[in-house]
């Protein structure tokens, strides 16, 4: 297959690209060139902001992708900026479980939806959870995975609503609460009861492929 990967140099996207290469697929990664691993697997690179992808429409046509993976769409405009350039081929999109109403309850400390969640659980009625609140570093105020899903829905894209994921190259350092204590020489780490299922990036990447 010839797979076009939008954003694919960090965390989950990086592992997806590596898995595609290991499988023998031809891969073209569209990214800004700010987080390109070195050394890395020998795949094609197109250095551009996704909002300027239309300037490289000929390169996309020449590559002639037979599948697309969108690994880093954070806003609706992130998607609409590429729809006119990316061909209508099978597409996989990384989304998040924060699209569910239960995420609002998590942020506000109120029970707003039944848990555990299932795929068809109620979606959030409110939008843009980080607007005016100062979200995580690098996350825009108009971040909204619901907008991402809606923008891709016209293409029949497969949307994967990922849970919290850990593993190598995680910029949010989700394991730091444990690693910090290990580095400090702690032999015991008192913690509360386990109430969260985590998924490892390596296996998430394999699932996408």
Region spans (language model):
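Conserved beta-loop-beta element that borders a ligand/cofactor-binding pocket
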Residues: 95, 146-169
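A conserved pocket-lining segment of Rossmann-fold NAD(P)-dependent short-chain dehydrogenase/reductase
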Residues: 181-201
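Conserved glycine-rich Rossmann-like NAD(P)H-binding loop of the short-chain dehydrogenase/reductase
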Residues: 26-32
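Glycine/proline-rich active-site loop of Rossmann-fold NAD(P)-dependent oxidoreductases
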Residues: 167-177
């Amino acid at each position: 297959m010839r797979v076009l990967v939008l954003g694919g140099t960090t965390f989950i996207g990086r592992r997806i690209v590596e898995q595609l290469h290991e499988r023998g697929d031809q891969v073209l990664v569209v990214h800004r060139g700010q987080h390109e691993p070195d050394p890395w697997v020998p795949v094609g690179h197109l250095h551009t902001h996704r909002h300027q992808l239309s300037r490289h429409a000929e390169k996309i046509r020449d590559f002639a992708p037979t599948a697309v993976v969108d690994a880093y769409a954070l806003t609706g405009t992130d998607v609409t900026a590429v729809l006119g350039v990316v061909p209508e081929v099978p597409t996989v999109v990384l989304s998040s479980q924060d699209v569910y109403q239960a995420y609002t309850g998590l942020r506000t400390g109120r029970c707003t939806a039944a848990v555990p969640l299932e795929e068809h659980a109620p979606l959030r009625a409110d939008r843009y959870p980080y607007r005016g609140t100062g979200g995580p570093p690098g996350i825009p105020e108009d971040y909204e995975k619901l907008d991402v899903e809606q923008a891709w829905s016209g293409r029949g894209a497969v949307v994967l609503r990922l849970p919290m994921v850990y593993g190598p190259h995680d910029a949010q350092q989700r394991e730091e609460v444990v690693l910090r204590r290990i580095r400090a020489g702690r032999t015991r780490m008192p913690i509360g009861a386990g109430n969260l299922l985590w998924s490892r990036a390596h296996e998430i990447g394999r699932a996408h492929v």
